[in-house]
Amino acid sequence: MIKTGRLCLSMEVIFFMAGFVLMGNLPAEAVPLREKAQLTYAPEVPLPIARKKPAIVEVYLDSAVKVMDLGPNVKYQFWTFNGHVPGPFIRVRVGDTLEVHVTNSDESGMPHNVDFHAVTGPGGGATVLTGVAGEEKAAYFKLLHPGLFIYHCAAPPVMDHIANGMYGLILVEPKKGLPPVDREFYVLQSEIYGKEPMEGQEVMEFSHEEGLKEHPRFVVFNGKTGSLTGEGVLKAKTGERVRIYFGNAGPNLISSFHLIGEIFDQVYREGDLLSPPARSVQTTLVPAGGATVVEFGLEVPGSYTLVDHAIFRVEKGAAGFLQAEGKPRHDIYVSKDDPEPCEGCLVHP
């Protein structure tokens, strides 16, 4: 028993002890599972959680500035998590303890942090994860609610950090997991507010003023125009069941998510995985800072288009494609004419 002085513990020891506390009242012989999160980047999704017990799940996020393609002949200086926009998809289980390590590699000196909408507590964790350049912050959070949640940087001014690319999705599976499907995809919508590029200017500059007006220059899926076209097209086969984890980082607009040519068989609105899903939905609203899970079967081969059905946004980049391969279904979809090419059309390839 220590009566005087200080007990100095390493960060590793403190985290190990904290992990035991957050895992609950465990029997003496029980040792909590520990694993490193298998992070993926859009449109890829980590494999479903196979274990049946809670674990301490390590997540490592690095904030850095990176110039990347935004559209044809347009680059943008993004603020990123792990060098990607959107940031990584994190998959955990309700009852898990999230061990988060956040490193600030932004050489500008700007502070960064993470607000997890899945975390219960002040700032969603942001209040204890704020770090300046070269600093690493870490914390433990027990995940009490299943669902699909946004996470984003919340350092001031928070709207600038979100608008510049610091966001991602975290899936907290229910204890019994989710029903199996054949394919899962990660799609996140966001807006880019930029100044009119000057002649010869390759990198578009961010405009806080355009953000205040809510006039985005681009509305995109997965960080850039055309991310789900060409080589980035989502691929599946007829007869398969598809699940899309869809988020809306905003920072301003509501998304009217729609898949041209299909009906969502099930929609877990606003990322709610506890209530029975809505069924046979044509278009679902996804608020800024929110998410949804949609599931559907593919009966007919062909190209299907993901859009924000606030349809003028298609011209700003909010369109992508899912290609379904398989045998024709003339009992469902038939015509004496072949499909005609849609020259200059943004919603049909």
Residue spans for each PLM region:
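Bacterial N-terminal signal peptides
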Residues: 10-23
